[in-house]
Regions:
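Non-catalytic, usually N-terminal nucleic-acid engagement modules in DNA/RNA processing proteins
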Residues: 1-56, 60, 66-73
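Extended two-metal-dependent nuclease catalytic cores across DNA- and RNA-processing enzymes
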Residues: 22-26, 76-193
Length: 193
């Protein structure tokens, strides 16, 4: 079975940047390269360990999404993106282009939406799909042939979540119920009450 690996760009970029915040990687020009360094290392590790046939990286588009239109306060409490991350994104995109890795960015839709659509279609076409993100929201997308890899906090490696692991972790009968559970819990990171 062929394998497709889908990466949530900004979730992994932010994780790389803040993961190295106490010992940032600074280049000879004085630029903080932690976000690019960490993201590229993550990609390299995934290519080596997962050995995918296909890889795509989904980026959130500039500007708002349809969620902002429906709920103007969506993500309104988040801090401004650090300048070091804004600097790193084009560097990362250049690297992905050089590697021949597909990048996907759809106006008005978050990377989560894009990855969900691609994962569903690819699984339907018989591919094994691995979604790579620290974002727990993706657990609702797990199904047969679609799993999730979550980078571990403070440790190396990943937590692999398939259908059974999602059911056990979230105490649900079906991964589709994760969306209901998270909706009831609210989400402070996205400013959802």
């Amino acid at each position: 079975m062929q394998k497709l690996v889908l990466l949530d760009a900004y979730a992994l970029i932010f994780r790389a940047y803040y993961g190295l915040i106490r010992s940032p990687r600074i280049n000879s020009k004085g630029q903080n390269t932690s976000a690019a360094f960490g993201f590229i290392n993550t990609l390299e590790e995934l290519l080596r360990k997962e050995n995918p046939d296909f890889v795509a990286v989904a980026f959130d588009p500039p500007g708002g999404t349809f969620r902002h239109e429906q709920f103007p306060q969506y993500k309104a409490t988040r801090d401004e993106t650090p300048e070091d991350i804004r600097w790193a994104v084009p560097v990362i995109k250049n690297f992905l282009t050089a590697y021949g890795v597909a990048m996907v960015e759809v106006p008005r839709f978050e990377a989560d939406d894009v990855i969900g659509t691609l994962a569903h279609r690819a699984a339907k076409d018989g591919l094994e799909v691995v979604m790579v993100t620290p974002d727990k929201d993706y657990a609702q997308l797990v199904q047969p042939n679609v799993s999730m890899l979550r980078p571990q906090s403070g440790a190396k490696g990943y937590e692999r979540l398939g259908v059974e692991e999602v059911k056990a972790k979230f105490e649900v009968e079906n991964p589709l119920q994760v969306i209901d559970l998270l909706g009831l819990m609210g989400d402070a990171a996205d400013n959802i009450p």
